[in-house]
Amino acid sequence: MNSVLISLSVTAAFFVVAAVLGFRLGRSPKPYPKLLLSVHALMFFAIAYGIGACLDKLSKTATDASITKVVLLVALGLLWANLVSGIVMICLKKKNRGWILAHKLVMFAMAISFVAAGVFMAMKW
């Protein structure tokens, strides 16, 4: 179970990097800087790989961590919703506050999912 917590911690670190880069992108004028945008998009793949690694390690452990798996699957679904809102924001000509708010709310919900997964893993649920 310790290796799962390490994987979740690394994934959370990638999540923090993505949030910081997103904050910088939010302060940038359109068109967005290509380097920041590409690194921010690459963080999507790092986070998706990290969630997949956590789910894979959970499936190999002997403990029944069904609640943790559900929370990680919710985080994965939120990650896909975040990708869609990010692509829409890139395609729009002007900054749209509604899409920015949706992107931030999904990121916040994903952060709550990561914290909940860590708590449930620590409690071995």
Where does each model-flagged region fall?
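Membrane-embedded alpha-helical bundles that constitute the cytochrome b-like, heme-associated redox core
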Residues: 1-125
